[in-house]
A protein has these predicted regions:
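SIR2/sirtuin-family catalytic core signature
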Residues: 1-77, 261, 323-475
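Glycine-rich phosphate-binding "P-loop"
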Residues: 163-188, 316-333
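An N-terminal, globular interaction/scaffold subdomain
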Residues: 46-125, 130
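Short linear interaction motifs
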Residues: 50-69, 186-195, 199, 250-262
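Acidic, metal/cofactor-coordinating or nucleic-acid-engaging core segments within structured domains
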Residues: 47, 284-287, 296-342, 346
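Short, conserved loop/helix-junction motifs that constitute active-site signature segments
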Residues: 195-203, 264-267, 369-375, 397
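Extended, H/D-rich, highly charged conserved domains that either
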Residues: 95, 100, 116, 120-156, ...
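A short acidic (Asp/Glu
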Residues: 86-92, 218-224, 283-285, 361-367, ...
Length: 475
């Protein structure tokens, strides 16, 4: 009965199956929980559907394709709440903080009606906490303009709600940090390998751009453990200040014995937190990043530092932020979204999304604009599609040939990804050199990228001197 019902992508995903589209696939390939292809007439790479599609088959199909895409001139990674959920489940068995609905005691009905209207206008069935905070902010500003005495009550309630939310984020970080050693190491190992698969680019290629909608600091912790140098718009050491101008700073080093020829340092990435961060605070006319430890018990003591000028939870730069006393209400988010557009809307650009549910219309519009450039490519990786926005974005797009889809309990599992499907989490010059040597010697393409296909190698006619010449040229 279950197999008969699973005929659409949504049903397959709901039943823990997988949806895949890579390489020359023209349509989505549906594979159920048992590994059977639901629509074999659409699948050209499983001629005999009597066999199940296992991880080895998936790997031979996915890993070479992603390895090729990751060599694009411009590579970007967009992470949503799914990455925090994945690491939290590995570390302590729970999904961590989610954007659950909150209840206002002041103007409850009015806020609820406005939230529902806003959600429907953006194509979502129901609103979330971000919608509720945004509507409450708008209402609060209106009440202050009118001089309504209820503005004080609403502001106090907003303060409590945001404080509780910040505390819940810190609690999720703490649960990861204090989980049992074996589970914590396993979770961190998966996170490190995941990030290194993207950041392991040679120094002469453009830096990886990491974008995230998350408020927590999980990606920063993973990068620190992996030895990845992150660069952002903040300048300073003790209490960095957000810089409005976008300077393309980079990291170089001087090789020993060589002067005047600096080389790009490997393992460097740029990070942009599109919705703000738990440790960003508005102080006066500036935005600062405070020294908030990962998993701290309470944020309030760190807001009482000298120089923050009475900052409280309402000054946290959590989108949509409550501290909108600037003439530009969208500051600094306009600059952050501009960085996203400038990074991905370029020829020969590849963007990989992981754990992003396509619930943000601002981001979706930028992704749609990116796909209007023929040489760009979008890879969507997700464990599921809970609000149906991923498949909706795909079905409505006119650029399906520029999209790869990996959705499901197998394909979206971060452990399976790092173990089987993502490229090596290292700069693998040895494999590249071996492939080039084989091609030069044998005159045929190497089958390293697809080990399931047996090599068809003719006897080499290359003499020893020619072989030595090839080796010398390679080295």
């Amino acid at each position: 009965m279950e197999e008969q019902q699973a005929k659409t992508p949504q049903e397959v995903i709901k039943n823990k199956g997988n949806v895949i589209k890579t390489r020359d696939d023209r349509e989505l390939i549906l594979i159920d929980l048992k590994g059977k292809v639901v629509n074999p007439e659409k699948c050209s790479w499983t001629p005999n559907n009597s066999e199940t599609v296992n991880n080895s088959v998936f790997r031979s199909r996915i890993e070479p394709w992603l390895t090729s895409l990751f060599q694009s001139e411009h590579l970007s990674l967009l992470c949503g709440s799914g990455i925090t959920t994945a690491i939290s489940l590995l570390a302590y068995g729970k999904s961590g903080t989610t954007m659950e609905d909150i209840t206002f005691s002041n103007y409850k009905d009015e806020i609820g009606a406005a939230v529902d209207a806003s959600a429907k206008a953006s194509g979502r069935e129901k609103g979330n906490m971000e919608d509720q905070i945004r509507v409450a902010n708008d209402l609060l500003r209106g009440l202050k303009v009118l001089g309504d005495e209820n503005a004080v009550k609403l502001e106090e309630e907003l303060h409590t709600i945001i404080t509780n939310f910040a505390t819940s984020l810190l609690s999720s970080e703490k649960e990861i940090a204090i989980s049992s050693e074996d589970k914590r190491e396993n979770a961190y190992r998966a996170l490190i390998n995941f990030l290194l698969s993207f950041a392991s680019r040679t120094g002469n290629k453009e830096r990886l751009n990491i974008f995230t909608t998350n408020y927590d600091r999980l990606i920063e912790v993973g990068a620190e453990l992996a030895g990845i140098h992150l660069m952002d718009r903040f300048v300073g050491t003790i209490m960095p200040i957000f810089r409005s101008s976008r300077l393309n700073l980079d990291l170089h080093y001087n090789p020993p014995g060589i002067r005047g020829e600096p080389r790009y340092l490997e393992g460097v990435a740029r990070i942009t937190k599109l919705h703000g961060s738990l440790d960003w605070v508005q102080s006066g006319g500036e935005i600062r990043r405070i020294g908030l430890p990962f998993g701290a018990a309470n944020i309030n003591p760190y807001l009482e530092a000298p120089g923050l000028q009475g900052a409280d939870a309402l000054k946290l730069m959590i989108y949509p932020n409550s501290a909108k006393d600037r003439e530009t209400a969208e500051y600094p988010y306009v600059e952050l979204f501009r960085d996203l557009a400038a990074s991905i809307c370029r020829p020969n650009s590849t963007l990989v999304t992981y754990g992003y549910g396509f619930g943000d219309e601002h981001i979706n519009r930028v992704l749609s604009d990116m796909l209007t450039i023929p040489s760009t490519h979008l890879v969507i990786i997700s464990y599921d599609d809970p609000i149906g926005r991923i498949l909706k974005f795909y079905s409505e797009s006119a650029h399906k040939d520029q999209m790869s889809i990996l959705i499901g309990a197998n394909l979206g599992d971060i452990t399976n990804l790092t173990k089987d499907y993502l490229p090596k989490s290292a700069i693998d010059r040895a494999t590249i050199r071996m492939a080039e040597l084989l091609q030069n010697r044998m005159g045929v393409a190497s089958n390293i990228a697809n080990p399931t296909i047996p090599a068809q190698i003719e006897p080499s006619t290359t003499n020893e001197s020619a072989t030595e010449e090839i080796i010398n040229s390679e080295s």
